[in-house]
Amino acid sequence: MASQVRFWVHHPNAQAVHRVDRAQSIFEAVAHSCTRFDPSSALMQANAAGKNWASVPAECFDAIAAALEAHQETSGLFDPRTLEALTSLGYGSTLPFETQQISLTSAAGGRGQKVGRIRPWKPGFDVARSAVRVGDEPIDLGGIGKGLAVRWCANELRDAGESILVEAGGDVMAIGVGPNGDGWMISVESPMGGSDPVAVLRLTDRAVATSSIRIRSWVVDGEQVHHIIDPRTRRPAQSFLRSVTVVHDDPAYAEVWSKSLFIVGRSEIRKLSDDKGLAALWVDVEGRVTLSRAMREYVAWRVSDV
């Protein structure tokens, strides 16, 4: 998780300092054990073990278990087995997305896939030993790790004050009614560029996450690619979308569903979000902003034309 975490505690109580310290420690533990960018991390040690058992700390064990739950909940649209695809596109290590245009040559090792096929994922868990068996393909927890860290930090901070906000790399959990008593006001960044948001959300006891290709896009062998991998093709999702924002009662599932809806793309996102009752806002490649039915209650303001 290449993100910093920020906490806001409105009207803190006597427990606040201790709870903030605890929440910071939780975030750091998740970031340390669940990163794919450190070969010595618990996640990468589990990836190296493959079909063999690997003992991991509790936060990594719980994150992999949560990833399996999300994989099942989304019927395979969320799939952490994206590491080989990202590595084959040159994203095996951190890249300076925010400071320069990136052009790379593809690496060997990416696997092709028949379009439309969802592959079952069946990792193993040994609770007594805190051990996991991820399987024959390495996994990346980037699609759920921030959301889980925000969830666990928010749970630690919940009783630290009247209202709490936890934010990590755009994943947000808003607890309570906020400083003004009418909800936390959260802006949704435009994926088309510029500093003006496409919407402002009013949230109370809700999480929000956005999946966007505004930053993590680069060129490989002359082709524009991005980091959101479609598990049906093992290639960057061809979705005709720029970003998807989801409001949910849980930050991990806000993150999971924002990516899953991005993957199904412009042609299917409205049906899936409405069928699942998901509060979603999406911006397509032409800059059009669209809301699902369930999102309307959270929108305090939205742009009329991007």
Regions found by a protein language model. Give the residues of each.
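Mature catalytic core of soluble alpha/beta enzymes
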Residues: 1-306
